[in-house]
Amino acid sequence: MTAVEGSSLTALNKGRLFASFDVDAFEVPGGRDEIWRFTPLRRLRGLHDGSAVANGKVHIRVSQQSGVQTEIVGRGDGRLGQGGIPTDRVAAQAFSSFQSATVVTVGRDMQIATPINIAVTGPDKGAVVYGHLQIRVCKFGEAVVVIDHRGSGTYADNVEFIVEAAARLTVVWIADWADDMVHLSAHHALLGKDAVLRHITVTLGGEVVRVSANVRFSGPGGDAELLGLYFADDGQHLESRLLVDHAHPDCKSNVLYKGALQGDPVSSRPDAHTVWVGDVLIHPEATGTDTFEVNRNLVLTNGVRADSVPNLEIETDEIVGAGHASATGRFDDEQLFYLRSRGIGEEQARRLLVRGFFGEIISKIAVPQVRERLIAAIEHELTITESRSTAS
């Protein structure tokens, strides 16, 4: 679904979204609105209706490296918004309300050997803040960026990834918030000619975390890979919404998201709930497009819900390939039986299957410390699963 600045919603087809920097151009979301129908609006603490007034501060720390420039800029900086236009009211509210933005620029021809680490600390419990972050990789540059979120509070932000011609950016976006955090994040990626983006989202913590990622190509030959890993526990709502907008020839996109869910039979909190919505639009002029998207969800216990909605809209016959797949279910009984027949205990067999399920994503993360951290986090969640099973 491509974003159309200032257009009427009624004039748009299924593959196009209204977009505006003006929060008043959007109606207050309701439960029947397509882009909000899975989101628990009552748990957003007013981020969606304008009643959440900023009263805190988010802390952003960027590691310093040669060839990388970090700036704190005001609202009037002309670079802000070049990556994309807000397509929902919360993103527009965040764009209208942030006080300063962090801009990280990788210079032309710069090959950054070690990851750029960006630590984002929440405003603290009871506080509300709006933010803006832009990552730009100039022509022929290359970088790996890890954006790590921790802490508490209520937060809405826009994050821009601008990858200029023949540049390469790998970004690992991690939400490891405290259990009380509400975070709505809109990601806007713009790829130049022959640019490459690897966008990986990892969602582990938080009460409500919703990430909306829009990817656009501004020239031919772009290559975007969007990977996601999420593990939802009791009381969590984790939502991922993707749009890959193909409007230029010979571009590629590959989407693979995997999630696991577990509940707590004695808890009074809402059931664990994950949402994945993947939209791909191929315009008439986007000949030679090659795209595929997959979402898999592994249900570990009762008391959970996983919604998965892939959408593919093709407006030209001259493509290399396009497809999507989605599946939600429990452990494969045949795989479990095979491991048990080899003398492996049931708990260990389940652990091995979950490790294998997520291994396809984890193996593609180019930062060893992040891989190790994710493996440890998954092991911790599985320990919780086993302890609840034993208690019941």
From Swiss-Prot:
> What Pfam families has UniProt attached to this entry?
SUFBD_core (PF01458)
Q: Which GO biological process categories is it annotated with?
A: iron-sulfur cluster assembly
Family recorded in the similarity comment:
Belongs to the iron-sulfur cluster assembly SufBD family.
Name of the protein in its database record: Iron-sulfur cluster assembly SufBD family protein ML0594
Give the organism the record lists: Mycobacterium leprae (strain TN)
